[in-house]
Amino acid sequence: MKHLITLTILLLSSLLMCSCSRSELEPCDDYRQAMRDFVVRISETARAQNPDFIVIPQNGIELVTLGEDAEAALATDYLSAIDGHGQEDLFYGYRRNDTPTPANTTDYLLSYLRRSKEAGNTILVTDYCSRPDYVANAHTQCDAEGFVSFAAPERELNVIPASVPPHENAQDIARLSDAQNFLYLLNPENFDSRADFIHAVASTNYDVIIMDLFFNDGTSFTADEIEHLKQKENGGKRLVICYMSIGEAEDYRYYWQASWKQHKPVWLARENHSWPGNYKVRYWYSAWQELICGPGDSYLNRILQAGFDGVYLDIIDAFEYFEKQ
């Protein structure tokens, strides 16, 4: 009988603990607005230090309007906080590399992207294709829309294309709206050293470089290295933008604590099985936002200290994950 009572108490305790953990979750009434507010906070924090700092969210283009479709009222506060939009797979790569994106998906994305462009934003499109005819068509389609095109040969974004950038030029690029092309080189795994990476990127004439803050060994690029990359090989000046994920936590980043895998902070959600080591986050939690853009040793402050011209925000579309829960 004592064993039965003990077992019952343990079961009740377990249920109470589960109930408490659920009740401890901060409610979010509007996942889309919460993401907009987060991006606005990042923008305001950065521009307090550098008024010219560039902010570019990637994907999650639905946030540009306040309703359920592209014709709804514009989210003006959000649009005022950003300088452009990054969009993956617009024409190629939605299902897999070197595959045309379904026409209905392209049309859906275009309906929002056009509104963002009309509001004054620069649209950076990354299509995942390497076939020469697909690459040429991706550039042509973007030109027709007034978008800036990059055809990524690999999904891992670890390759500098062998071809010259579209609309290669020697102009000084002072604003994102000046850009006619860009390089998205997020993963430096194919480079044996920092010096090799710096040399390879510096030897290009792209108007904008989007890269990570860190090299393969986990050390961040220095302000001197970033300053060196701000000059094209032909002598023109360019912008160097830093990638930062704000909708997922990554277990290889400096902020990650080993204990989180056994004792998750309340804002840490499920692992993304498509990208092992990446975890969805409840991005409306102040504790997560402090890691990203709070005072002190936040991710954003590290980016600012390294001298980047702006930030390229990923997993903006995390709101979709929570809307489906």
Regions found by a protein language model. Give the residues of each.
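Positively charged n-region of N-terminal signal peptides that target proteins for export
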Residues: M1-L4
